[in-house]
Amino acid sequence: MMIGFIAIVVVVVMWYVGTMNKLRAAALKVDEADSGIDVALTKRYDVLTKQLAVVKEYASHESKTLYETIRLRQGMSMKEKSDVAEKMNEVASQLHITMESYPELKASDNFMALQSSITDVEEHLQAARRLYNANVTSYNTKIVMFPASIVANVLGMTKRELFEAEEYKKQDVEMKF
């Protein structure tokens, strides 16, 4: 009887440790994907800043301030990162409108290279968002499914938020000047 009890305890402990390790691995994947979004946003900011410099070289005047400096910091919530991404979308839209006013700018090799870079950066950012959301969904599913939810509760694991656009950001943008 004692051997049976010890065997049950060993099985339960092994299950607990295995489940704990799986949940922690899922949390690490979410953190890694979160870092991927930070990298993509930083790269996007750098490319937009370079494009703005090229536009300013060709423009004889500035009608508006086209961007505000956005500092990406560790520990931003997904909502804050989403807001930063939206501000960068506005900057990109304004840059494209400004570019239309200067046809010679569109022919610039530097500008064309930057346009290509922006496309690459946008694709990378979208991929980072998809990876993050996939990892968050997997993690959130694991921590609420019984019996793993018991271990998740003991470890204090909580649901993570998805990176998603707010309703008004899903609609077409109307530019007014």
Residue ranges, per PLM feature:
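A helix-centric hydrophobic-segment signal that preferentially recognizes long
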Residues: 1-177
